[in-house]
Amino acid sequence: MDESGDTDMFDKKGRPLPNVSNLFMIGLAIIDDPEDVRAKLDNLRNQFLADPYFTGVPSFQDDAKKTAIMLHAKDDIPEIRWKVFDLLSTIPVKVAVVIRRKEDMRRDAQSIFQSTGQKITDNIIYDNVVTMLFRYISHTKGDCEIKFAVKKKPRNAALLAAINSSQASLKSKGNRVTTRIKVSSEHSRNDACLQLTDYYLWALNRLYINQETRYIDKLKDNFNVILDVDDIRNMKGGELFTRHNPIELIKIMPVSS
C-alpha cells in the first residue's frame, strides 16, 4: 500500500494552505507472487543503472536518492517511466484505490471542528481512507500480509485497527469475513512492490490532474476498484469505478484547484 498527495489543508491560523496537492489517494496492489514482482522490477532498475545512456542523469546520482535507489514515477525521467509502464502492463495485479479531494476534505474538517471542536489530524484522515478502502477488498482469501509504505514512523497497530473496522462493518452487513491480516511497514526503497503501487497512483493522478490518459490506459485492466469519495453526482457514497464500469476521463468530475 502507498499514498499519493498529502493531507495538508490549513496553516496554524486555520487558513487554507497554498501549494498543496488537490488530491489525496491511498492505493493497494494485491500481488499473488511478490517475490517475482520484486525480481522483475529490481532487474529492470539494475539494467538502467548499468546502461551508459543514463550516465550523468541527475536522478541516477547516488546523492540524489532517486532512481539510483528506487523507482519512483514522479522522479524518474520519461525514458524510465516508459519502460516501467511497459513492464507493469505485463504483471498481473489487482489494484484498489480510494480518492479524496482536498476541497471537500477542508469542508469536512471545518464542519467537524465547528460542531465538535475536534481538529482532524493527518492520521485520522489516513486511517479513515484505509477503512473505506478495505470495505471493497475480499476478506475470504485466507491469511495475508498488508505492507504499508512508511513515510515517517510505522503505525502498524493503528492501521490494523482501521482494517479491522472495515471487517467489522462488513460482518455487520452479513458479509463473510475469514481473512486474518498481518500489517507491516517498509520504506519504498526496500520493496519494489511498493514502487509498483506508486506507479499506479501516479498514473491515476495524471489522469485526474493533467487529463492524461496514456498512462492509465497501460494499466487500467488491473484496477479492480477506484472509489472517488467526493464525486457524489450519481451516488451518495461516491463514484465507484470497477471492471464493469472502468474509469475514463469523460466520467471524472473535474478537480478544483
Residue ranges of model-derived segments:
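Phosphate-ester processing/binding pockets and catalytic centers
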Residues: 1-257
